[in-house]
């Protein structure tokens, strides 16, 4: 079982799945055992409840769904899961290492 679970939520998932791959590589390169996955924003309630996938230790929203931050932040707080929006620059440049570092900062 992974040490930490990092969930990303986005609108559709294609570009976010590429970012997940880059985050997984950055974690592996640093000897970290993280489960990192992406799902649609429609799955946020299930993710926060740990239904259908492990409950995340942190939830990151893709910048294209940043407008949902207020609504999701309330749900995440109730679930005890820190969350934030991925920086547009890091998302656009697919900087998996930077997004991973942001997730780690939220978990600490």
Curated annotation (Swiss-Prot):
UniProt domain PTS EIIB type-3: residue ranges: 3-108
State the deletion phenotype: Disruption of the gene abolishes growth on lactose and severely impairs growth on cellobiose.
The UniProt entry, under Gene3D superfamilies, shows: 3.40.50.2300
Q: What induces it?
A: Induced by growth on cellobiose. Negativelly controlled by the CcpA regulator. Also induced in response to galactose.
Q: Which reaction does it catalyse?
A: D-cellobiose(out) + N(pros)-phospho-L-histidyl-[protein] = 6-phospho-beta-D-glucosyl-(1->4)-D-glucose(in) + L-histidyl-[protein]
An example GO BP is: phosphoenolpyruvate-dependent sugar phosphotransferase system
Give the source's domain of life in one word: Bacteria
Has the keyword Transport been applied to this entry? yes
The UniProt keywords, alphabetically, are: Kinase, Phosphoprotein, Phosphotransferase system, Sugar transport, Transferase, Transport
What does the record give under GO molecular function?
kinase activity; protein-N(PI)-phosphohistidine-sugar phosphotransferase activity
- Which residues are recorded with the post-translational modification Phosphocysteine? 10
PROSITE patterns attached here? PTS_EIIB_TYPE_3
Q: Where is the active site?
A: 10 (phosphocysteine intermediate)
Q: Which InterPro entries does the UniProt record give?
A: PTS_EIIB-like_sf, PTS_EIIB_2/3, PTS_EIIB_3, PTS_sugar-specific_EIIB
Q: What is its EC number?
A: 2.7.1.205
Provide the function of this protein: The phosphoenolpyruvate-dependent sugar phosphotransferase system (sugar PTS), a major carbohydrate active transport system, catalyzes the phosphorylation of incoming sugar substrates concomitantly with their translocation across the cell membrane. Involved in cellobiose transport with PtcA and CelB. This system can also transport lactose.
Per the record, what about its domains? The PTS EIIB type-3 domain is phosphorylated by phospho-EIIA on a cysteinyl residue. Then, it transfers the phosphoryl group to the sugar substrate concomitantly with the sugar uptake processed by the PTS EIIC type-3 domain.
**Protein name in UniProt:** PTS system cellobiose-specific EIIB component
Source species: Lactococcus lactis subsp. lactis (strain IL1403) (Streptococcus lactis)
């Amino acid at each position: 079982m992974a040490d930490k679970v990092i969930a990303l939520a986005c609108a559709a998932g294609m570009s976010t799945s590429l970012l997940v791959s880059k985050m997984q590589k950055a974690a592996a390169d640093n000897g970290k055992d993280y489960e990192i996955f992406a799902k649609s924003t429609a799955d946020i309630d299930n993710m926060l409840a740990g239904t259908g996938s492990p409950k995340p230790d942190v939830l990151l929203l893709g910048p294209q769904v940043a407008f949902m931050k207020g609504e999701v932040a309330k749900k995440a707080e109730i679930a005890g899961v820190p969350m934030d929006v991925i920086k547009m620059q890091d998302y656009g440049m697919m900087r998996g290492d930077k997004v991973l570092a942001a997730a780690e900062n939220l978990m600490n």
